[in-house]
């Protein structure tokens, strides 16, 4: 598990430094010094800890990584983020995508453990059998379906994640309000889901444009919210159930975002 977490962190940190993971510091921010090795990750333009705090941290054995970036973070709510890398990788640390680019820009399975197609229209995605939420519940194809439907909701109205290429989704990229299913997204079993496109699509396009950006959310936790509430609920700024290796502890759009390790990370 430690090896897998380290690999994921390395990938995320590489992406952060190259593609701007999270928010920038103000113009009068102090330059962040290299942190002690960490369990908490702070993406910031400011020094995350004072000298005294750093000394206490080192003494206690905590491990902290500070990352300075140049862009500001729009949101960490998966339902309202755009397709910029800064937002994507900030969310990735909490809510895993189906696949991700590795350090060599090859696709690596993350939440999924296989994606197959025989006709470049029907894409069969299998969710890793070991995948669980931080509360111990299994991550299922129903979570993936729910997340897709809400991202394509006209009430949520995320205009950057365009799903009009899938059967059952309107040309405007939205499903009907309150939709519980569409023909282009079919759950086969608890761990398998099929995506069907209107026209043939290469596997590379499916993975890079859709599987990389579909952050699966815990249906059993958030289905109590109305579609309108999905864009305004504070829960998404401090989620207590995640699938990724980290959880947000503190967040300021213009300055920083801080994470702590998810002790129940399944990888």
Predicted feature residues:
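N-terminal lobe/hinge region of extracytoplasmic solute-binding protein
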Residues: 68-119, 149, 241
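Bacterial N-terminal signal peptides that target proteins for export
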Residues: 2-9
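Bacterial lipoprotein signal-peptidase II cleavage site
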Residues: 24-33
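Gly/Pro-rich hinge or "lid" segments in bacterial periplasmic/extracellular proteins
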Residues: 201, 209-267
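Surface-exposed binding/hinge segments that line
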Residues: 116, 161-223, 250-252
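Short, well-ordered beta-strand elements
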Residues: 61-71, 122-126, 144-147, 193-194, ...
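Aromatic- and charge-enriched surface segment that lines or borders ligand/interaction sites
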Residues: 113-160
């Amino acid at each position: 598990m430690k090896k897998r977490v380290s690999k994921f962190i390395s990938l995320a940190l590489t992406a952060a430094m190259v593609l701007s993971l999270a928010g920038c510091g103000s113009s009068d921010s102090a330059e962040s010094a290299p942190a002690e090795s960490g369990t908490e990750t702070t993406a910031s333009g400011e020094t995350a800890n004072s000298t005294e705090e750093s000394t206490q941290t080192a003494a206690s054995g905590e491990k902290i990584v500070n990352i300075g970036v140049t862009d500001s973070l729009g949101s960490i709510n998966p339902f309202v983020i755009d397709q910029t890398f800064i937002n994507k990788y900030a969310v990735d640390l909490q809510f895993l995508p189906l696949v991700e680019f590795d350090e060599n820009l090859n696709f690596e399975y993350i939440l999924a453990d296989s994606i197959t197609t025989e006709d470049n229209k029907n894409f069969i995605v299998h969710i890793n059998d070991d995948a669980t939420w931080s509360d111990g519940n299994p991550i299922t194809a129903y979570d993936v379906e729910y997340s897709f439907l809400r991202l394509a909701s006209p009430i949520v109205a995320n205009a950057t994640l365009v799903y009009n290429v899938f059967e059952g989704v309107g040309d405007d990229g939205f499903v009907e309000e309150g939709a519980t299913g569409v023909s282009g997204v079919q759950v086969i079993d608890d761990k398998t889901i099929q995506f069907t496109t209107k026209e043939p699509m290469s596997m590379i396009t499916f993975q890079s444009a859709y599987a990389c950006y579909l952050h699966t959310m815990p249906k059993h936790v958030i289905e109590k919210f109305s579609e309108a509430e999905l864009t305004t609920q504070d829960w998404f700024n401090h989620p207590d159930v995640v699938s990724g290796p980290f959880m947000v502890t503190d967040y300021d759009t213009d300055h920083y975002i801080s994470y702590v390790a998810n002790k129940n990370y399944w990888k």
